């Protein structure tokens, strides 16, 4: 086979055997180089604060792990989520353990603390949000079947690592969304679920 590099493309000649026939094919393969941080063109924290956000609020219902809280902040920053509501026992910034996982996203993503999750849900409903519990429940809609209205604002309630979303919160939500799972475990980590 012949190989030459031109304009950051690699030209490769290779033989392929399909159904007993030998075919000679030439393909361009892009040379993949990891980008440097300076090449990513990310927003500054100041520009992020002023940027347009997606109309989504993440509600954390009694999340006990500081690492999970930090991960949710980092994911929310990546997708420009409008805000995070921290409820009940969920820890709030500033916190060194949250910062360790969030890598500063707790300083860019807006957040608000509520003593009770139902109080946060009531506020969201009054402000016109469609509130969705992410939970395994009777009548839940599988994520791959979910139809969203792009003209609406949404809030997703993420439950405690052991008990999930409180039933009194589920009762006050517009819909339950369930992530299909095909293995042996009953649930996913809450920060992974938020990312999905």
Outline where the language-model segments fall.
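Short, small-residue-biased leader/transition segments that mark boundaries at the very start
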Residues: 1-5
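Post-transcriptional modification and biogenesis factors for structured RNAs
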Residues: 13, 17-196
């Amino acid at each position: 086979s012949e190989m030459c590099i031109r304009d950051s493309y690699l030209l490769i000649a290779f033989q392929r055997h399909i159904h007993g026939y030998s075919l000679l094919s030439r393909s361009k393969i892009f040379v993949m180089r990891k980008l440097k941080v300076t090449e990513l063109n990310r927003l500054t924290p100041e520009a992020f604060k002023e940027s347009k956000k997606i109309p989504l609020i993440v509600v954390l219902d009694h999340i006990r792990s500081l690492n999970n809280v930090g991960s949710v902040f980092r994911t929310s920053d990546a997708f420009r989520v409008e805000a995070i509501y921290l409820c009940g026992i969920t820890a709030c910034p500033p916190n060194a353990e949250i910062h360790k996982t969030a890598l500063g996203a707790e300083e860019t993503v807006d957040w608000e603390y509520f003593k009770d999750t139902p109080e946060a849900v009531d506020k969201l409903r009054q402000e016109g949000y469609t509130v969705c519990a992410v939970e395994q429940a009777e009548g839940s809609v599988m994520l791959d079947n979910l139809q969203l209205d792009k003209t609406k604002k949404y809030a997703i309630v993420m439950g405690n690592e052991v008990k999930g979303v409180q039933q009194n919160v589920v009762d006050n939500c517009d819909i339950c969304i369930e992530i299909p799972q095909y293995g042996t475990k009953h649930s996913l980590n809450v920060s992974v679920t938020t990312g999905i």
